[in-house]
A protein has these predicted regions:
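C-terminal beta-rich recognition modules with glycine/proline-rich loops and embedded aromatic residues
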Residues: 1-58, 76-100, 105-109, 113-121, ...
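Extended extracellular/luminal ectodomain segments enriched in beta-structured repeat modules
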Residues: 60-67
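Short acidic, flexible loop segments centered on an aromatic residue
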Residues: 70-74
Protein backbone atom coordinates (compact mmCIF):
# COMPACT_ATOMS: atom_id res chain seq x y z
CA UNK A 1 0.00 0.00 0.00
CA UNK A 2 2.81 2.45 0.82
CA UNK A 3 4.23 1.93 -2.67
CA UNK A 4 0.81 2.48 -4.26
CA UNK A 5 0.30 5.75 -2.39
CA UNK A 6 3.62 7.07 -3.69
CA UNK A 7 2.65 6.08 -7.24
CA UNK A 8 -0.83 7.67 -7.17
CA UNK A 9 0.22 10.99 -8.77
CA UNK A 10 1.22 9.04 -11.87
CA UNK A 11 -2.18 7.36 -12.09
CA UNK A 12 -4.37 10.47 -11.80
CA UNK A 13 -3.95 11.89 -15.30
CA UNK A 14 -3.17 10.62 -18.78
CA UNK A 15 -3.26 12.19 -22.22
CA UNK A 16 -3.03 11.71 -25.98
CA UNK A 17 -2.45 14.34 -28.67
CA UNK A 18 -5.82 16.04 -28.15
CA UNK A 19 -7.35 14.41 -25.08
CA UNK A 20 -6.86 14.70 -21.31
CA UNK A 21 -7.99 11.85 -19.07
CA UNK A 22 -8.82 12.46 -15.41
CA UNK A 23 -8.72 8.97 -13.90
CA UNK A 24 -8.77 9.72 -10.15
CA UNK A 25 -10.10 12.53 -8.02
CA UNK A 26 -8.40 14.52 -5.29
CA UNK A 27 -6.69 17.85 -4.73
CA UNK A 28 -3.91 18.12 -7.29
CA UNK A 29 -2.24 20.24 -9.94
CA UNK A 30 -0.55 19.18 -13.18
CA UNK A 31 0.46 20.42 -16.62
CA UNK A 32 -0.40 18.37 -19.70
CA UNK A 33 1.60 18.83 -22.95
CA UNK A 34 -1.05 18.43 -25.66
CA UNK A 35 -0.16 18.61 -29.33
CA UNK A 36 -1.50 22.18 -29.65
CA UNK A 37 -0.08 23.54 -26.41
CA UNK A 38 0.25 22.95 -22.69
CA UNK A 39 -2.75 22.88 -20.39
CA UNK A 40 -2.50 23.33 -16.62
CA UNK A 41 -5.20 21.69 -14.50
CA UNK A 42 -5.92 22.35 -10.85
CA UNK A 43 -8.33 19.99 -9.13
CA UNK A 44 -10.06 20.53 -5.79
CA UNK A 45 -12.17 17.84 -4.16
CA UNK A 46 -13.04 16.14 -0.86
CA UNK A 47 -13.61 12.87 -2.71
CA UNK A 48 -14.34 10.13 -1.66
CA UNK A 49 -16.33 11.82 1.13
CA UNK A 50 -18.03 14.51 -0.98
CA UNK A 51 -19.62 14.15 -4.38
CA UNK A 52 -18.35 17.30 -6.11
CA UNK A 53 -15.10 17.68 -8.03
CA UNK A 54 -13.89 20.99 -9.48
CA UNK A 55 -11.22 21.38 -12.15
CA UNK A 56 -9.89 24.72 -13.40
CA UNK A 57 -8.22 24.58 -16.81
CA UNK A 58 -5.48 26.97 -17.89
CA UNK A 59 -4.53 26.36 -21.53
CA UNK A 60 -1.66 28.43 -22.91
CA UNK A 61 -4.08 29.66 -25.56
CA UNK A 62 -7.64 28.89 -26.61
CA UNK A 63 -7.44 25.26 -27.58
CA UNK A 64 -9.94 22.66 -28.77
CA UNK A 65 -9.46 19.29 -27.10
CA UNK A 66 -11.35 16.55 -25.29
CA UNK A 67 -11.61 16.28 -21.51
CA UNK A 68 -12.44 12.76 -20.31
CA UNK A 69 -13.48 12.30 -16.68
CA UNK A 70 -13.80 8.82 -15.20
CA UNK A 71 -17.28 7.90 -13.99
CA UNK A 72 -16.98 4.99 -11.54
CA UNK A 73 -19.18 1.90 -11.90
CA UNK A 74 -21.01 2.72 -8.66
CA UNK A 75 -22.09 6.08 -10.14
CA UNK A 76 -23.01 4.91 -13.63
CA UNK A 77 -24.74 1.55 -13.25
CA UNK A 78 -26.83 -0.50 -10.87
CA UNK A 79 -23.95 -2.39 -9.32
CA UNK A 80 -21.27 -1.36 -6.84
CA UNK A 81 -18.30 -2.76 -8.75
CA UNK A 82 -17.71 -4.27 -12.20
CA UNK A 83 -18.38 -7.97 -12.67
CA UNK A 84 -21.98 -8.40 -11.58
CA UNK A 85 -21.22 -9.82 -8.12
CA UNK A 86 -22.67 -6.99 -6.06
CA UNK A 87 -25.84 -5.39 -7.49
CA UNK A 88 -27.62 -2.57 -5.71
CA UNK A 89 -30.83 -3.61 -3.98
CA UNK A 90 -32.74 -0.75 -5.62
CA UNK A 91 -32.09 0.67 -9.05
CA UNK A 92 -31.67 4.39 -9.58
CA UNK A 93 -31.82 6.72 -12.55
CA UNK A 94 -29.45 9.30 -11.05
CA UNK A 95 -26.50 10.07 -13.28
CA UNK A 96 -23.34 12.13 -13.09
CA UNK A 97 -23.80 15.83 -13.87
CA UNK A 98 -21.10 17.96 -15.48
CA UNK A 99 -21.10 21.74 -15.63
CA UNK A 100 -18.73 24.07 -17.46
CA UNK A 101 -18.67 27.63 -16.14
CA UNK A 102 -21.85 26.93 -14.12
CA UNK A 103 -23.85 25.60 -17.08
CA UNK A 104 -24.76 21.93 -17.36
CA UNK A 105 -23.30 20.34 -20.49
CA UNK A 106 -23.92 17.14 -22.41
CA UNK A 107 -21.26 14.46 -22.54
CA UNK A 108 -20.68 11.14 -24.23
CA UNK A 109 -19.60 7.98 -22.42
CA UNK A 110 -16.56 6.13 -23.74
CA UNK A 111 -15.22 3.12 -21.83
CA UNK A 112 -16.16 4.52 -18.44
CA UNK A 113 -15.18 8.13 -19.14
CA UNK A 114 -17.49 11.11 -19.64
CA UNK A 115 -16.06 13.01 -22.61
CA UNK A 116 -16.54 16.70 -23.41
CA UNK A 117 -15.06 18.23 -26.55
CA UNK A 118 -14.95 22.00 -26.92
CA UNK A 119 -12.66 24.98 -27.31
CA UNK A 120 -11.22 25.70 -23.89
CA UNK A 121 -9.91 29.00 -22.55
CA UNK A 122 -8.12 30.21 -19.44
CA UNK A 123 -9.99 29.81 -16.13
CA UNK A 124 -12.66 27.50 -17.53
CA UNK A 125 -14.27 25.75 -14.56
CA UNK A 126 -15.45 22.16 -14.85
CA UNK A 127 -17.63 20.74 -12.09
CA UNK A 128 -18.45 17.05 -11.82
CA UNK A 129 -21.21 15.89 -9.48
CA UNK A 130 -21.37 12.17 -8.74
CA UNK A 131 -24.51 10.68 -7.16
CA UNK A 132 -23.29 9.63 -3.71
CA UNK A 133 -26.24 8.59 -1.61
CA UNK A 134 -26.05 5.61 0.75
CA UNK A 135 -26.94 2.41 -1.13
CA UNK A 136 -27.89 -1.11 -0.08
CA UNK A 137 -25.90 -3.83 -1.83
CA UNK A 138 -26.72 -7.52 -2.27
CA UNK A 139 -24.60 -10.45 -3.43
CA UNK A 140 -25.51 -12.76 -6.27
CA UNK A 141 -26.99 -16.09 -5.02
CA UNK A 142 -23.76 -17.94 -5.74
CA UNK A 143 -22.11 -16.12 -2.83
CA UNK A 144 -23.86 -18.34 -0.30
CA UNK A 145 -22.09 -16.83 2.72
CA UNK A 146 -23.98 -13.57 2.13
CA UNK A 147 -27.41 -15.12 1.57
CA UNK A 148 -30.06 -13.17 3.48
CA UNK A 149 -27.66 -10.30 4.14
CA UNK A 150 -27.06 -6.81 2.78
CA UNK A 151 -24.30 -4.22 3.03
CA UNK A 152 -24.25 -0.43 2.85
CA UNK A 153 -21.98 1.58 0.56
CA UNK A 154 -21.66 5.28 -0.14
CA UNK A 155 -19.77 6.33 -3.22
CA UNK A 156 -16.67 4.12 -3.45
CA UNK A 157 -16.63 3.35 0.29
CA UNK A 158 -17.89 0.17 1.92
CA UNK A 159 -19.34 0.64 5.40
CA UNK A 160 -19.42 -1.68 8.40
CA UNK A 161 -21.09 -1.92 11.79
CA UNK A 162 -18.82 -1.98 14.84
CA UNK A 163 -20.05 -3.23 18.19
CA UNK A 164 -18.62 -0.14 19.91
CA UNK A 165 -21.20 2.04 18.10
CA UNK A 166 -24.19 -0.28 18.29
CA UNK A 167 -24.08 -1.48 21.92
CA UNK A 168 -25.30 -4.98 21.03
CA UNK A 169 -23.63 -8.05 19.65
CA UNK A 170 -22.94 -7.70 15.94
CA UNK A 171 -24.64 -11.07 15.43
CA UNK A 172 -27.89 -9.59 16.77
CA UNK A 173 -28.04 -6.72 14.28
CA UNK A 174 -30.72 -6.91 11.59
CA UNK A 175 -31.66 -4.44 8.89
CA UNK A 176 -35.31 -5.50 8.90
CA UNK A 177 -37.40 -3.13 6.80
CA UNK A 178 -34.76 -0.40 6.72
CA UNK A 179 -34.74 1.45 3.41
CA UNK A 180 -31.72 3.32 2.09
CA UNK A 181 -33.82 6.50 2.04
CA UNK A 182 -33.71 6.37 5.87
CA UNK A 183 -29.92 6.67 5.93
CA UNK A 184 -28.61 9.90 7.45
CA UNK A 185 -25.03 11.02 6.81
CA UNK A 186 -23.47 12.54 9.93
CA UNK A 187 -19.97 13.61 10.85
CA UNK A 188 -18.34 11.99 13.89
CA UNK A 189 -17.71 14.81 16.35
CA UNK A 190 -14.97 13.48 18.61
CA UNK A 191 -12.26 10.89 19.08
CA UNK A 192 -9.79 9.42 16.62
CA UNK A 193 -12.47 9.27 13.90
CA UNK A 194 -13.45 12.92 14.27
CA UNK A 195 -14.68 14.30 10.95
CA UNK A 196 -15.30 10.87 9.40
CA UNK A 197 -18.74 10.52 7.84
CA UNK A 198 -20.99 7.92 9.42
CA UNK A 199 -24.22 6.38 8.14
CA UNK A 200 -26.93 6.53 10.79
CA UNK A 201 -29.92 4.22 10.41
CA UNK A 202 -32.90 3.94 12.79
CA UNK A 203 -31.23 1.09 14.70
CA UNK A 204 -27.68 0.78 13.33
CA UNK A 205 -24.64 3.03 12.98
CA UNK A 206 -22.08 2.35 10.25
CA UNK A 207 -18.56 3.65 9.69
CA UNK A 208 -16.27 3.30 6.65
CA UNK A 209 -14.71 -0.15 6.61
CA UNK A 210 -11.18 1.26 6.49
CA UNK A 211 -11.68 2.89 9.90
CA UNK A 212 -12.48 -0.39 11.62
CA UNK A 213 -10.58 -1.39 14.78
CA UNK A 214 -9.34 2.04 15.82
CA UNK A 215 -11.36 2.51 19.02
CA UNK A 216 -10.61 0.26 21.96
CA UNK A 217 -10.37 -3.49 22.30
CA UNK A 218 -13.82 -4.43 21.04
CA UNK A 219 -13.06 -5.38 17.45
CA UNK A 220 -16.33 -7.10 16.52
CA UNK A 221 -17.43 -5.86 13.11
CA UNK A 222 -19.71 -6.84 10.21
CA UNK A 223 -20.02 -5.58 6.64
CA UNK A 224 -22.79 -7.99 5.67
CA UNK A 225 -25.74 -7.60 8.04
CA UNK A 226 -28.78 -9.86 8.34
CA UNK A 227 -31.85 -8.58 6.50
Amino acid sequence: ISRLILQMPGYMYAYSDDKIYVSHYGGSKTTIPLENGKVMLEQTSEYPYESDIKIVLQPEKENKFKLAMRIPTWASSNEFAPGGLYPYKKETTEKAIIKVNNEEVAYTMDKGFAVIERKWKKNDLVELHLPMQARLVKSIPEVTENEGKSAFTRGPLVYCAEEIDNKVSIKELTLGNIDESQAQITSIEEGILKGIQRIDLPNIKLVPYYTWCNRGDNRSMAVWIND
